């Protein structure tokens, strides 16, 4: 007879036995979070000696490149394996055609070069998207009716990804959700000799209300206004569609896939991992961070909620986590908490 949980009966089975001591709890732990699972997203400013707090993201700052290099010393010492860069584009450099996105002297490109030179062992992941660079805050080029044009936008995204690879980024991460952009970027990278540049595809990126603080951070909230991204980001009600998106991106040459946001979409993380067994990442987005940090600062939740929330992503099947809590999590893990 096969053994199933239904065959286990009290008192011979006491599930609390293995919870009795710390050593046995550690021995039977099914999922373990380590610093190797963490990616820290950072917001990069133009200028020198610049630091700006983000009111909707307590504890997170926008940093100029010189300040970013100073902070990165500590992040590297903590063992954080990679940073995800998000540039804050000056208003005067935004345009309808998002040309600043592929400027070789743009903020992301300069930050990538500086970080690679100072910390050659540190992974640099760059955001491939147009919303920080457009005057309207959308992730692509618009037609006369305000609709985001898919194929025209891809042409700009390809130029942006190539500029990041040429600056030294080891991973480019298209977050735009245009159809076919992964294949176009992969083909361009191969043709340009960037065969080892990885693509982390934002494959299942939902049209979520949890992105608000991020848009404040990169300065696109005012540009987007009351607009939305429902014509290209996924409907939060859909689950099967996420599998189609992931399948398409893997077929087009993605090396890693992502689910975004994280906590409200743990079911999607599990489905993606079970279906494809591909490297699967999840983004604990700005709204999730703001909720947790607000509760921590007000004494409503203990700081231990940070590691608990990140462990939930591991339990759901994630191989890595983009989180603004990466530094705090690394410190807590080092202390054994």
UniProtKB/Swiss-Prot annotation:
Activity regulation, per record: Stimulated by magnesium ions.
Cellular component per GO, a single term: cytosol
Cofactor: Mg(2+)
Superkingdom of this protein's organism: Bacteria
Active site as annotated: 205 (schiff-base intermediate with substrate), 260 (schiff-base intermediate with substrate)
EC numbers, comma separated: 4.2.1.24
Keywords: Heme biosynthesis, Lyase, Magnesium, Metal-binding, Porphyrin biosynthesis
Gene Ontology BP terms: heme biosynthetic process; porphyrin-containing compound biosynthetic process; protoporphyrinogen IX biosynthetic process
Binding, 5-aminolevulinate 1: 215, 229
Stored Gene3D superfamilies: Aldolase class I
GO molecular function: porphobilinogen synthase activity; zinc ion binding
Binding-site residues, 5-aminolevulinate 2: 286, 324
Binding site for Mg(2+): 245
Family: Belongs to the ALAD family.
NCBIfam families in the record: PRK09283.1
The protein's role, per its UniProt record: Catalyzes an early step in the biosynthesis of tetrapyrroles. Binds two molecules of 5-aminolevulinate per subunit, each at a distinct site, and catalyzes their condensation to form porphobilinogen.
Summary of subunit composition and partner proteins: Homooctamer; formed by oligomerization of dimers.
Name of the featured protein: Delta-aminolevulinic acid dehydratase
Taxonomic source organism: Pseudomonas aeruginosa (strain ATCC 15692 / DSM 22644 / CIP 104116 / JCM 14847 / LMG 12228 / 1C / PRS 101 / PAO1)
